[in-house]
Every structure is written in C-alpha cells, then in structure tokens.
C-alpha cells in the first residue's frame, strides 16, 4: 500500500484553488482516496503549466528527495486532481491530461 500520495493539480487552477476539496477527500479517505492507510502522507504539486511537460522535472525532483530521505519510490502513487481529469466548476478537463499521465508512467509511477 502507498505511503505517499502525490496529487498533481492544474497549474492554472491552483492559482485560484487552494486544493481544500482534494485534501478533505484524502483525509476522509473518500472517493479515489478510499483504502489508503491512516499513516499515508499527502503531497500536492502542480503540473508545471501547459502542456504539462514540467511535471517531468517535478518528478525528477521528487525522486531526488525520496532518495535523500531514504524513502522508496515504490511506496508512492500519483493521482491526477479532479481539476485535471474532470469537467468541474474550475474548467473543462485538461486537454493535456493523457500526455501528463504518459510522462508520469514513463517515470515509473502508477497514476490514478
């Protein structure tokens, strides 16, 4: 089971959204966060801006931090936030969501 859940938020939406609903869902273990252990940690980062290519650099930074702190990357799972994948009150789904998912998967992480 994952020990760290990383949530990728839309860079544009993040400028006006604090991510409270995502955080609340995580701590209540509702929706896509159902089933995570109580000691699972939570981290949010943005995609880096359109077209999402910046997420590659952010994942490389995450890899360096995991190594430095002795954490195993196999304990990390990445979620795409609702502002990226769904049509909601912020905006329509990100047109680059499949590209972002592909980058994350190429870096060896599961994407939810």
Task: Give the ranges of each region predicted by the language model.
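Active-site nucleophile-His-acid catalytic modules used for acyl/amide transfer and hydrolysis
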Residues: 79-83, 88-89
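Structural motif
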Residues: 4-6, 76-79
């Amino acid at each position: 089971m994952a020990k760290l859940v990383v949530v990728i938020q839309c860079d544009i939406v993040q400028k006006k959204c604090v991510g409270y609903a995502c955080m609340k869902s995580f701590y209540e273990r509702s929706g896509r966060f159902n089933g995570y252990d109580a000691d699972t940690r939570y981290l949010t980062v943005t995609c880096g801006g359109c077209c999402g290519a910046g997420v590659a650099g952010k994942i490389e930074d995450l890899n360096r931090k995991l190594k430095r702190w002795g954490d195993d990357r196999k304990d990390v799972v990445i979620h795409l936030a609702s502002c990226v994948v769904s049509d909601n009150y912020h905006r329509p789904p990100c047109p680059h969501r499949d590209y972002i998912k592909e980058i994350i998967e190429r870096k060896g992480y599961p994407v939810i």
